[in-house]
UniProtKB/Swiss-Prot annotation:
Name of the featured protein: NAD(P)H-quinone oxidoreductase subunit O
InterPro entries: NdhO (IPR020905)
Major localisation: membrane
Catalysed reactions, semicolon-separated: a plastoquinone + NADH + (n+1) H(+)(in) = a plastoquinol + NAD(+) + n H(+)(out); a plastoquinone + NADPH + (n+1) H(+)(in) = a plastoquinol + NADP(+) + n H(+)(out)
Function as written in the Swiss-Prot or TrEMBL entry: NDH-1 shuttles electrons from an unknown electron donor, via FMN and iron-sulfur (Fe-S) centers, to quinones in the respiratory and/or the photosynthetic chain. The immediate electron acceptor for the enzyme in this species is believed to be plastoquinone. Couples the redox reaction to proton translocation, and thus conserves the redox energy in a proton gradient. Cyanobacterial NDH-1 also plays a role in inorganic carbon-concentration.
Species assigned in the record: Gloeobacter violaceus (strain ATCC 29082 / PCC 7421)
Record's GO cellular component terms: plasma membrane
Cell compartments where the protein resides: Cell inner membrane
Signal peptide per UniProt: none
Origin: domain of life: Bacteria
Quaternary data: NDH-1 can be composed of about 15 different subunits; different subcomplexes with different compositions have been identified which probably have different functions.
One Pfam family in the UniProt entry: NdhO
Similarity comment: Belongs to the complex I NdhO subunit family.
Keyword entries, A-Z: Cell inner membrane, Cell membrane, Membrane, NAD, NADP, Plastoquinone, Quinone, Translocase, Transport
Length: 78
């Protein structure tokens, strides 16, 4: 199912490592990107604005192919 605004997602480490975004940033990714659910706030082209609510951090833009719907969200739509 395609990711859309309001979806709960997690970052996929394999897709984020060695990406263009990894080359432009510190690649010591915070664990909350992969271990907690983030909500899609906005979509623009291939990118989604994600707010991870478990920690007080600003939202981040990630490519949609670097995201996977979280288990809880995917199960509730099945």
């Amino acid at each position: 199912m395609p990711i859309k605004k309001g979806s709960l997602v997690r970052a996929v480490r394999d897709k984020l490592d060695n990406s263009l975004e990894a080359l432009a940033n510190d690649t010591r990714w915070p664990s909350y990107l992969f271990e907690t659910d983030g909500e899609v706030l906005d979509m623009r082209g291939d990118y989604a604005l994600i707010k991870f609510g478990a920690v007080p951090t600003p939202p981040v833009w990630l490519r949609q192919d670097q995201l996977a719907e979280s288990g809880a969200a995917a199960e509730s739509t099945s």
